[in-house]
């Protein structure tokens, strides 16, 4: 049994987890998450400097709690991993420096993990996760991407958002509607009392320079602007803004766009397994719609466990375990962090000469 201590500090969650695997079975021994939502809610979004300082404050306590809850001593851990890209650089440094320091203190090998690969790996804690090639919809506050994953974890991005990520659009529309931060859960909650067909909001597409539209790519900036114009018009007319109806209509359109393009991409690439991960993957409307539409096409849907949709260290540990199992990858202790790194460049994190 391989055991990994993993650290995640790429944005506004401070998380430490102890995970292990035996063959194809992955187990979480502890997964402690300290959220900073209350610290950032008054600003309507994450303040990078504040987030980094909070990680410095919280990480020692989160680390101690993760070890205590797992009943595993750090000397018994086989590997130590941390998120190194992409993310907020100051936040990434806190986790990475801590992880590499622990590696030096306890003579443990280090793995730097790509944050998006971590999200992809959250599905490993689900029953009957796909063992062959599959399509992943990764949909979160910072990313909306369609990624093909082969049976050896080779990754190819097939679609992306050209502006706002879906989760970012939820936050911005939530703010427009006067809802609390983060916008995703707030919109989902109030949308339950609204009519999702009340407003005909646009499904924005990206033009292809060769003609037509890019079939697998996303754009949510125009949808956000449409909601803004709608709210402005209602206010100018002197009427009460029907927040539940707007929230429900917005939520429906986002889910429809995500589902339609995911199913189209899966069909075009002959992939009969779709994985949905990331913070927005917790949205119930999206989950139900994806399953319903995929069933019509004989495509099986694998949903990330609800408690592992948002940022957490267990998914980082799972990514590390998978790397060790199939590719025997280790990172240099000289590896730094980066705010940007495409998923196709994840293998560079294990080169003898680090990319940063």
UniProtKB/Swiss-Prot annotation:
Substrate binds at residues 138-142, 171, 184, 283. It catalyses: L-threonylcarbamoyladenylate + adenosine(37) in tRNA = N(6)-L-threonylcarbamoyladenosine(37) in tRNA + AMP + H(+). InterPro entries: ATPase_NBD, Gcp-like_dom, KAE1/TsaD, TsaD. One of its GO terms (biological process) is tRNA threonylcarbamoyladenosine modification. GO terms for molecular function: iron ion binding; N(6)-L-threonylcarbamoyladenine synthase activity. Pfam families: TsaD (PF00814). Its main location: cytoplasm. The keyword Metal-binding applies. Fe cation binds at residues 115, 119, 311. Binds 1 Fe(2+) ion per subunit. SUPFAM superfamilies: Actin-like ATPase domain. The keyword Chaperone does not apply. Disulfide bonds: none annotated. Its cofactor is Fe(2+). Its EC number is 2.3.1.234. Required for the formation of a threonylcarbamoyl group on adenosine at position 37 (t(6)A37) in tRNAs that read codons beginning with adenine. Is involved in the transfer of the threonylcarbamoyl moiety of threonylcarbamoyl-AMP (TC-AMP) to the N6 group of A37, together with TsaE and TsaB. TsaD likely plays a direct catalytic role in this reaction. PANTHER family: TRNA N6-ADENOSINE THREONYLCARBAMOYLTRANSFERASE, TRNA N6-ADENOSINE THREONYLCARBAMOYLTRANSFERASE, MITOCHONDRIAL. This is tRNA N6-adenosine threonylcarbamoyltransferase. It comes from Prochlorococcus marinus (strain MIT 9312).
């Amino acid at each position: 049994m391989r055991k990994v201590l993993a650290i995640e500090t790429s944005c506004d969650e401070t998380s430490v987890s102890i995970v292990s695997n035996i063959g194809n079975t992955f187990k979480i021994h502890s997964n402690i998450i300290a959220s900073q939502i209350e610290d950032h809610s008054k600003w309507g979004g994450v303040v990078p400097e504040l987030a980094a300082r909070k990680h410095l404050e919280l990480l020692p306590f989160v680390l101690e709690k993760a070890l205590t809850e797992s009943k595993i001593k750090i000397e018994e851990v086989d590997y130590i991993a941390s998120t190194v890209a992409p993310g907020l650089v100051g936040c990434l440094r806190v986790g990475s420096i801590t992880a590499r320091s622990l590696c030096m203190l306890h003579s443990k090998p280090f793995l730097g993990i790509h944050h998006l690969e971590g999200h992809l790996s959250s599905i490993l804690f689900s029953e009957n996760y796909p063992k062959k090639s599959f399509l992943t919809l990764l949909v979160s506050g910072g990313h909306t991407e369609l990624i093909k994953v082969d049976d050896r974890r080779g990754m190819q991005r097939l679609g992306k958002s050209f502006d706002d990520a879906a989760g970012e659009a939820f936050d911005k529309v939530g703010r427009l509607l006067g809802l609390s931060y983060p916008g995703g859960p707030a919109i989902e909650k109030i949308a339950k009392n609204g009519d999702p067909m009340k407003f005909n909001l646009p499904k924005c597409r990206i033009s292809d320079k060769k003609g037509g539209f890019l079939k697998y790519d996303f754009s949510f900036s125009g949808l956000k602007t449409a909601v803004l114009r709608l709210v402005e018009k209602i206010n100018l007319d002197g009427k009460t803004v029907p927040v539940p109806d707007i929230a429900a209509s917005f939520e429906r359109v986002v889910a429809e766009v995500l589902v339609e393009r995911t199913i189209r991409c899966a069909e075009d690439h002959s992939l009969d397994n779709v994985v949905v991960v990331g913070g927005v993957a917790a949205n119930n409307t999206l989950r139900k719609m994806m399953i319903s539409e995929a069933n019509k096409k004989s495509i099986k849907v694998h949903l990330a466990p609800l408690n592992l949709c948002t940022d957490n260290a267990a998914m980082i540990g799972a990514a590390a375990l998978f790397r060790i199992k199939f590719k025997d990858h280790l990172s240099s202790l000289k590896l730094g962090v980066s705010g940007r790194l495409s998923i196709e460049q994840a293998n560079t994190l294990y080169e003898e000469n680090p990319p940063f």
